[in-house]
Design a protein with these regions (language model features):
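Thiol/selenol-based redox catalytic cores and closely related redox-interacting motifs
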Residues: 103-182
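Thiol-based oxidoreductase modules, predominantly thioredoxin-like and allied folds used
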Residues: 72-89, 104-116
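Conserved helix-turn-beta segment immediately C-terminal to the redox Cys motif
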Residues: 39-42, 50-51, 55-79, 98-102
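N-terminal "domain-start" segment that seeds a small globular fold
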Residues: 12-36
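Short loop/turn microsegments at loop-to-beta-strand junctions
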Residues: 20-21, 43, 163-165
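Bacterial Sec-dependent N-terminal signal peptides
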Residues: 1-17
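Non-catalytic, surface beta->alpha helical segment in thiol-disulfide oxidoreductase systems
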Residues: 177-196
Length: 196
């Protein structure tokens, strides 16, 4: 018996022809979200955690959302428990934590795997579109090496190393930039402004 597998064609630059708008994911209330509703918006997609050293970045993400949401920015948080079990709560507990401690009003999705056999197709796409983040300077490069050493879910070079990896997607979905967990949200505000 022969089996036929059809794979999506790739552009000459080895990036997938698909765009973020071709994907769906469950939000934190269990409702399917069709990302096609975000076409024409700048998206900032982040894998998040409530018990991480980078958790205070929720404040910076919310500040960006409040400043630019009327200009077309949508921040979307994907809670993830793959990195040292720093997101142990239920979807409801995570949402309450984010609201009470960080004033989060941007959309939160259901707890999601971002690496491995059960990773969300959204993150499979994002990692293919932007396979590595930029680490500038010795301290940042040392952080990358350390994170890669302790991240048990990392199997491929494109895998996410830790919580608060950020993906910035242009209005037409053609450009995807990836920012390291150590990158504070305000540090790439000019990139957001350029896309709006």
């Amino acid at each position: 018996m022969a089996m036929l597998f059809v794979l999506p064609s790739c552009a000459q630059n080895n990036k997938p022809m698909a765009k973020i708008y071709d994907y769906k994911a469950l939000n934190n209330k269990g409702v399917e979200v069709d990302f096609s509703q975000y076409e024409g918006k700048v998206l900032l997609i982040v894998n998040t955690a409530s018990k991480c050293g980078f958790t205070p970045q929720y404040d910076g993400l919310e500040a960006l959302y409040q400043k630019y949401k009327d200009k077309g920015l949508v921040v979307i948080g994907f809670p993830c428990d793959q990195f040292a079990h720093q997101e142990p709560g239920s979807d409801e507990e995570i949402a309450e934590f984010c609201r009470l401690n960080h004033g989060v009003t941007f959309p939160l999705m259901a707890k999601t795997d971002v690496n491995g056999a059960n990773e969300s197709p959204v993150f499979t796409y994002l990692k293919a579109a932007a396979p590595t983040e930029e680490y500038k300077g010795f301290k940042a490069k040392a952080t990358r090496t350390m994170l890669k050493g302790i991240s048990k879910s990392v199997e491929k070079d494109s895998d996410i190393l830790w919580n608060f990896t950020k993906f910035l997607i242009s209005k037409d979905g053609s450009t995807v930039k990836r920012f390291a967990p150590v990158a504070e949200p305000a540090s790439f505000e000019k990139d957001i402004e350029a896309m709006l």
